[in-house]
Amino acid sequence: MLQGKALDLKELIRPYYLKWIYFPVSDNHCPPEFKRWRQYPSVPLELAKQIVSSASDGLPDALFLPMTDWHGIRQRSQQMARGFSGLGHRCFYLNPHLGREFPQVYPLSQKRLLTSLEPRIAELHVHLLREPVFHHRRLNREEVETVTAGILAMLQATESSRQLSIVGLPVWTDVALRLREALHTPIVYDCHDLLEGFDGIGQDVLDQEGELFASADLVVFSAEWLAHEHISRRPELAGKAVVIRNGADSQHFAGVVRNSGGGPVTVGYIGALNSWFDIQAIRAAASEHPDWRFLLVGPTGSGFPKNAFAGLKNIQLIGEVGYQDLPAWMARFDVATIPFLIQPLTMATNPVKLYEYFACGLPVVSSPLAEVARYSDLVYLAGDPAEFVRQLERAVQENDPSKRDARRTVAIRENWRSRSETLIAELAKIAGV
């Protein structure tokens, strides 16, 4: 009981501490995704029609209840929304921070805002009193009602007549169920990670995944290994499950040409650095080749030690960069890497970065992940640090234009628009959308 009250008190105090003390102390303290959002035009819901296009005839609106902030690292949910919008669907994307992104504390702020992101894509912001960390715990009844009411008000303001819910994290299960009860909105669970492999996911959120599996009209898995793992536990999923892998926005990377400046061999990585990153593989390669340069581009998580590359001056931690800047960084790479430890979390992943590397034609050295091994003729697989070094040496020496062309062909074929088309077709079979 006392522990629960302490948690309640901490949640009530945290928004004031963050916005009045922690964020103002340093510009670096405020998450970059919050700053990026504030650069877009936002309006109260009653003015929604000023920034949202009219619904397309015959096409349902797509409600994305995601695992990721739109303004953070570009991941599956953002790309699927872009795919849907490219097919004519309006997309509404819920910001998962539930008020923490607002510059003002709850009593002083707007409670609902709609942000215009791109043509046919808008982002809903709902401010909750406690601003709960969305992957730490289940939403309570009042919070579910507030989020649901915000979505319903948005749909009314934008004259939405048909919708489908694409749920990327089980914390939104109760919201999706309320929407289905009120509007007969089909529920898609887009399961793209083995959630139990993350340290920061609350146990009651993990418990909710079973409820979401049971209630979803369609379950989409992003990887074959992930699908097999869950269906082996819940055989009843087999009748409503489909594998739809990740993809690439190949046009975004189409102009990438290796910078020919005569500099050192450059080995690159794009993505988060956390507990699943194989530090020893990169250390071994950097130690063996001190004349090479290693560029690791992406945010570091709490599971990544600060001294991971102590003593290795040829390794640069670049930090998070905007999606628009990724092509310029990849143009510096001679070889791209996916150095992941082999564990259930990584075996369940279908790395977006693989398709993005392919879109640039880059040779890729990777741990033997199940989804990467499907392209064994186009990648260099390495099962331990010593082999990782050897495969990097092979990849650096690659001089086969046909392989670069083949990789680009894969990226063009495995695009986000086609993934969205497949999802719509699969949902139509089950829910009549």
Regions found by a protein language model. Give the residues of each.
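Nucleotide-sugar-dependent
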Residues: H71, Q75, F277, Q324-W329, ...
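Carbohydrate-associated surface elements
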Residues: W225, I244-G247
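A charged, aromatic-enriched C-terminal amphipathic alpha-helix characteristic of glycosyltransferases
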Residues: D400-I430
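Membrane-proximal helix-turn-helix segments that form the acceptor-binding/catalytic region
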Residues: M80, L152-M154, G202-V219
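Nucleotide-activated donor-binding/catalytic signature segment of Leloir-type glycosyltransferases, i.e.
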Residues: F304-M330
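Conserved donor-binding/catalytic core segment of Leloir-type glycosyltransferases
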Residues: S260-F277, I282-A286, F294-V297, I412
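Acidic anion/phosphate-binding donor-loop and adjacent secondary structure
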Residues: G197-Q203, I231-S232, A248-G263, S275, ...
